[in-house]
Amino acid sequence: SACNETDNLVLKSPDGKIQLTVTENDNTISYAVNKENAAMILPSKLGFILEHEDSLNHFVIKGTERSSLDETWEQPWGESRYVRNHYNELKVLLQETDGKRKLNVIFRLFNDGIGYRYEFPQQESMDSLVIMSEETEFRMSGTHKAWWIPASDPYYECIATFSPINELDTVRTPLTMETAEGK
């Protein structure tokens, strides 16, 4: 393993106010997010359930890649003509403990939020896959307010529902949240 149980990977937003920590413990990868030293997302696990395959959830960290970007692009319409795309990125290279499959998780921290995505690199042990369920957890630190669209709604072009996160059911992404402190 490139990391042991006490190792943490840390990524900060460009202004340093948001911090992401990725931890490997007992072959489980989790992440947590703080903003201005206050917990926003408590340690939360990553993983998948695949069709006709063992669950993808027993990993070790094999490496990392870091990058940053600060660019401005022009959009044809919208509230702002020019949009700043400014972030720090951490790509975490994962491998199952049996060495069979690989998975990468790419985190991006912006000054006003975070994003993540999974990447299945090309590999001999997996020529195709069907994801039955994404098991990523979001253990929030409080009862935040959220704007969301029900997963059962077939359209994205609808009015978002506003409610406390403890009242959410299955939702579509993106999900927008705000703490009581306005963070």
What residue spans do the PLM features occupy?
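N-terminal accessory beta-strand-rich subdomains and adjacent acidic, glycine-rich linkers
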Residues: 8-183
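Bacterial Sec-dependent signal peptides at the C-terminal "C-region" and cleavage site
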Residues: 1-8
